[in-house]
């Protein structure tokens, strides 16, 4: 099973694009309290000065609301919102077309900016810093440089991998914002709101059960809510109770920690095949037949946040929490081995 086929992948799928469930303001947005509070200040200050907001960089795992926050920012600034992604901007001309069509103080959102073509990135530097495009027209001896003035705009970019951004690009963002996984309480509020907008009767236990298995990710919470609704409707249930949510998600092979078959294969392979580790990421990728990027960006962030694995210079190792979840007996010297690897990491 590839990551794209998983119910709990945080990557965007067509069914996730339901604008009616998205919050429309920062006050309506649940979670990320510190980031929201700071963004409110920056937005209000920019509006009071009548200036474009400084460029913003959102950093964090997929599905935490980076696109939604960018849309809300444009709405609260009272400006137009245009959206694209790094892989889509293949040539300098593609970027030039986007930038020259922006009006004063507009917001341009670029998702996956770490996947931007290096040649395009070079064009972006003067656009962000001086609001100018410096293009080369023609070829050979007839080539000439043309400068095009741009409207003062705000670039809002998102990345799941800050380390892949070049230093010159990273330094041009005046407002870096790191987004964290959501708590179960925050996700419960999100599930309740989604159920209310769907006209779905939801008990406290039902909302809590869905939130517990959503891997700290609102996008996954919304997807699980829709699937649980299907089970509840077919069962002609008057409300989504904890029992109905538990039965539905168990049948969908999402366990009580939000792990699915691929997650369990990941943990089991390290435990059984490699004695709990350490094992390198390339070996894990080969064993799972999954791309390295998918493992590092999709599977491991939640595993680390939940304390299932540790990353060390020698590879991944399972923690006592992971062994307990698998129902397997950990090695007798597990704590000592982990301590030694931690010292090596330092």
From Swiss-Prot:
Location of the protein in the cell: Cytoplasm
Basic and acidic residues composition bias: residue spans: 1-16
Chain positions covered by the region annotation Disordered: 1-23
Its EC number(s): 3.6.4.-
Region (Large ATPase domain (RuvB-L)) location: 1-182
Record-linked SUPFAM superfamilies: P-loop containing nucleoside triphosphate hydrolases, Winged helix' DNA-binding domain
Region of interest (Small ATPAse domain (RuvB-S)), residue spans: 183-253
Chain residues that bind ATP: 21-22, 63, 66-68, 129-131, 172, 182, 219
Swiss-Prot/TrEMBL GO biological process terms: DNA recombination; DNA repair
Reactions catalysed, as given in the entry: ATP + H2O = ADP + phosphate + H(+)
SMART domains: AAA
Gene3D superfamilies (UniProt xref): 1.10.8.60, P-loop containing nucleotide triphosphate hydrolases, Winged helix-like DNA-binding domain superfamily/Winged helix DNA-binding domain
Complexes and interactors: Homohexamer. Forms an RuvA(8)-RuvB(12)-Holliday junction (HJ) complex. HJ DNA is sandwiched between 2 RuvA tetramers; dsDNA enters through RuvA and exits via RuvB. An RuvB hexamer assembles on each DNA strand where it exits the tetramer. Each RuvB hexamer is contacted by two RuvA subunits (via domain III) on 2 adjacent RuvB subunits; this complex drives branch migration. In the full resolvosome a probable DNA-RuvA(4)-RuvB(12)-RuvC(2) complex forms which resolves the HJ.
The protein's name: Holliday junction branch migration complex subunit RuvB
